[in-house]
Each structure stands twice: as C-alpha cells, then as structure tokens.
Amino acid sequence: MNSPLIKVHSQKWSKEWTRLFLSKKHWICILDSPIDQKLVKECQRYPISELDRVTKNFYSKNNYENIMKKLVYLISCDYTNKNIKLIDGYHIQLVYVKKLLQQDFNNAIVLVNTAISWIEYAVAAKFELVENKHGHSLTRKIKKLSNDIDKYSKKDPKKTYLVELYQVSLCLDDLWDTNKQNFEDGRYNVGIGRHSIQHGRVDPRRYNAEIMEKLICLLYALVKLPEIEDVIK
C-alpha cells in the first residue's frame, strides 16, 4: 500500500494504523461504529502476527454476536432515507439472512452470492449508476475512486473519513479486479471476488464464515459512510 495515508498514519498501534493494517486483509473498521472501535482497541493489545486471528475471534465469539449486531443495524436502517444505499427488497433479504446465520453460520455457503449482490447495488447507488445505461462503468468508477483518494490524501491526509474510504476502496478494488480472478485457475483455486462469484466459477464449499463476515462488514461501512462527494471535494 503506497497511499499517502499510510505514510501519515505510520505510527504502529495508532487507531488509524490498526484500521489500515486490518484493511489489507479486507477487514473494514470505521470511526462511526462502537463495534469497530471495540475491535481496534482489542487489536492494539496484540502483536501484528496475531491481528487476523484476533479479528476472526472477535466476530465469531458468542455465536457471532458482533457480526449479528452489524446485521441488526442494517435491518433497522430507515430505507426511506435516500442516503441509505439499499432498497426494501434487500432489507427483506437481510432479515432472512440473519435468521439463517443465527440457525447455523455455515449457511454462508448459500448466502455469499446474495451478499455480493448487496455490495454491488450499494456501490452502484453510491456512484449513481443503478438506473443508468452506463452501469457497466462501475469498475472504472472504483478505480477512479482509488486515484481520487490518493490525490486528496496528498492535500489533506488527516481529513475525516479518508481512512475509511481508503479501506473500502482497497476492498472494492480487489473484489472487482478480474486479474485476481482467473477462471483458468479452476474452481478450487480461482480468486474469490465479484467476477468469479457472479459467474459461478467458485466451488461454493469455499464460501466460509470469514468471507460472509467480511462482506457484511463491507456493506455496513458502505451504508454508514457519508456520500463519496462529501468526503472527496
């Protein structure tokens, strides 16, 4: 990661550094979340080599209590609010998904495809491409977001929400990067992302709790973050 944000927040174990480090593993932590604040505080007590394990345990302990809290937040959102980038149909799906995961989190094997559709809708809505003939340009928009973050980070690397937006951008870049999802690698080895999931190139047995948790955390961040143009301007 060569973003100016990394250089500015290079002090180990600062809140920003911890969140940026976790984002390399696609664990998204945002400021406006008591759940994420608790995770960051927990991570600051451990060496770097333990952070991935600590995060996995944080979300899986007590019958996935913390990930369920994020689902409860998403379910309780006011879907009439234009700033909430989901629609009633996805709200209904979230209710059913929560029930299935509460019964057995291994039900993620049949839910990852659904979660990817939430992510794509939320991102398209952020870029105002849901009902737009240029919807296919979503990949370019995601790449442009990364470049914009770098540009604005050089101007004001401590600006509120840039770290959050950088985390989300990093995750979206990887999810949409077809170069990391080569079909010829086969269903047991192909990179797991939007392209390989939507086109059915991944053996569903690879859809585990961790992947589902990360997608829920990403959706949670996309819904809670302010509008992109309010951050980068």
Where are these regions (language model features)?
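A long, hydrophobic alpha-helical segment
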Residues: T80-E120
